[in-house]
Amino acid sequence: MSETNSGGKCPVMHGANSTENRDVMNWWPEALNLDILHQHDHKTNPMGEDFDYREEVKKLDFEAVKKDLHALMTDSQDWWPADWGHYGGLMIRMSWHAAGTYRIQDGRGGGGTGNQRFAPLNSWPDNVSLDKARRLLWPIKKKYGNKLSWADLIILAGTVAYESMGLPSYGFSFGREDIWHPEKDIYWGNEKEWLAPSDERYGDVEKPDTMENPLAAVQMGLIYVNPEGVNSQPDPIKTGEQVRVTFARMAMDDEETAALTAGGHTVGKCHGNGDAGALGPEPEAADVEEQGFGWSNPNMKGKAANAVTSGIEGAWTTHPTKFDMGYFDLLFGYEWELKKSPAGAWQWEPINMKEEDKPLDASDPSKRHNPIMTDADMAMKMDPKYRAICEKFMADPEYFKDCFARAWFKLTHRDLGPKARYIGPEAPAEDLIWQDPVPAGSTDYCEEVVKEKVADSGLSISEMVSTAWDSARTFRGSDMRGGANGARIRLAPQKDWEGNEPARLSKVLKVYEQISAETGASVADVIVLAGSVGIEKAAKAAGYEVRVPFLKGRGDATDEMTDAPSFEYLEPVADGFRNWQKKDYIVKPEELLLDRAQLMGLTAPEMTVLIGGMRVLGTNHGGTKYGVFTDREGQLTNDFFVNLTDMAYSWKPVGNGTYEIRDRKTDQTKWTASRVDLVFGSNSILRSYAEVYAQDDNGEKFVKDFIAAWTKVMNNDRFDVQA
């Protein structure tokens, strides 16, 4: 490269391509950021719009992939040597730390997208050395190409690692589609530094259940809890309390938590045999010559035993490449005392351990070292509930292995969705309650007869549309839970949610259940089809003959198929589409709207057209009139947008997040509005969409676009026909 410009002015333009460029959100940080609705489109995806991974992966030679992974486990590489000549522990940690970011509160995180390849996860302090694990997998990814996503490979590698060390797998499903840039919708925490004290995300760090929602990890940059103890201060009882809350927020109960802790720490080791301060920067901060690697270790010198990751040093068991009962044998067979690792981290070591019980050195089989336990491990012994579970496991090793295999499957498949989405020969046939099973619904009924009965039922357009919406809006694309299939709006806890207006809902469901009994259609299908009836009726009243697309075949779930406590997390605390929120929150109503729209898989234009349609259809919660900018309520018109953009009106705040829309000449109040309504006129991007639908030539376009977006929402969870 020429040095002509050395010392002179920069020869390229500053601005769009500069890392110093200040974008809109820098200048106006309080502005509504719509970016979470504009993620993962075809412009960032090198595979193109026509590529369908879930079809492509079905062509994969599943057995050949597993054979290659088994071979990889013991093929130690000089550039990153394997502990005891086996990469199993490293691969399990990689899989675990991918899947373990899942949290049940919003369904985000998890291993379903291959996001560990990108910031911030690729550079989290808890993910030190996982860059090496993924690079070890590259030859396999390269070989199988488009038929095997990174997301599937990362999770499969951990499962095969367990198999290679003696644990039969409960099963595995393919079907995880890769993303191509970091997610913008996941809130990892508000801290400004890695591993900031836990106090920053707890109301009271002494009370683990006061952790900020929807977070699950105790510190920024950790997957679960601090292995040294709460804020790096060892106290197994306190750590056990954090473990319980953290794993519960990741959808695990006490038995699953104990099984995962024990099974996860039966194999592999912690790495802290050196100075953590000597490590180079994380991948995102490393120089270009590192080629995506981070945490370079000048003291590695080709020996696995010299690695530094967590700072804790040592294996948990006598045979770290074998899945056995060694974890329990050592944890409960010895007394333990606090020590410091070579890297200065707190760890527990055994008192007077027999030499033959000590694990071999990871690089030199002529040496043995003390095993270690983290503070979380000691909680399994000292917390009474966890201890009782562990004692049950010790008394029945086969039960422990089965519990762990099932918990591992749940951990790695929780965000993949229902069983209908499973792909591959090892997908288990058993129905598991956490999969939210739904029985197949009938398609052997006359759709038109159902529609006629709904139309003659005396229900209003608002009742029909609102009930269908409430049933479908629970869908979360984050973990593929919720939605209209199953009609769980009939069951606890959904039937009693404030946002579902229980009294109205009960009245409507009685009508639908009767129609279901008379026609053979499932209640789930009747709910959705009734929404179609309401929309078609409203469109006809506005002068448009339309037919809302409909797919038969939804089933009706039962209470026995429903894990009611886990569905509590799907309860809406706000729904801008129905102009409702449960109470006042620090987060603005329009931001809550964006969050729900993103979980439902909506784009900004789809969100916009749905708001406009829902308002004129009179679907506001409790029948309020906020945002009903029309004199023709019940007709599917573009009046919401026409009147929102009409400069004949002014907008005056009247308190509690509400506004009056006044005639500029008479100062008379014409309508009322919420912040959610007015943001479609105030935000420049949303206003641009609102103006499209307000145009004189776009009345019909509005109706068509509303129906298309509505149909998308109703079918979001139809994995039985998508798979």
UniProtKB/Swiss-Prot annotation:
Alphabetized GO MF terms: catalase activity; heme binding; metal ion binding
Keywords: Heme, Hydrogen peroxide, Iron, Metal-binding, Oxidoreductase, Peroxidase
Function: Bifunctional enzyme with both catalase and broad-spectrum peroxidase activity.
Sites annotated Transition state stabilizer: 93
Official protein name in the record: Catalase-peroxidase
The reaction(s) this protein catalyses: H2O2 + AH2 = A + 2 H2O; 2 H2O2 = O2 + 2 H2O
InterPro entries referenced in this protein's UniProt entry, alphabetically: Catalase_peroxidase, Haem_peroxidase, Haem_peroxidase_sf, Peroxidases_AS
Textual note on the cofactor: Binds 1 heme b (iron(II)-protoporphyrin IX) group per dimer.
Xref: PANTHER family: CATALASE-PEROXIDASE, HYDROPEROXIDASE I, BIFUNCTIONAL CATALASE-PEROXIDASE
One GO cellular component term: cytosol
SUPFAM superfamilies: Heme-dependent peroxidases (SSF48113)
Catalytic center residues: 97 (proton acceptor)
Superkingdom to which the source organism belongs: Bacteria
Cross-link entry Tryptophyl-tyrosyl-methioninium (Trp-Tyr) (with M-250), positions: 96-224
Quaternary structure, from the entry: Homodimer or homotetramer.
Residues binding heme b: 265
Family: Belongs to the peroxidase family. Peroxidase/catalase subfamily.
Pfam families: peroxidase (PF00141)
CC cofactor: heme b
Reported modifications of this chain: Formation of the three residue Trp-Tyr-Met cross-link is important for the catalase, but not the peroxidase activity of the enzyme.
Chain segments annotated as coiled-coil in the UniProt record: none
Record location of the Tryptophyl-tyrosyl-methioninium (Tyr-Met) (with W-96) cross-link: 224-250
Any GO BP: cellular response to hydrogen peroxide
EC number: 1.11.1.21
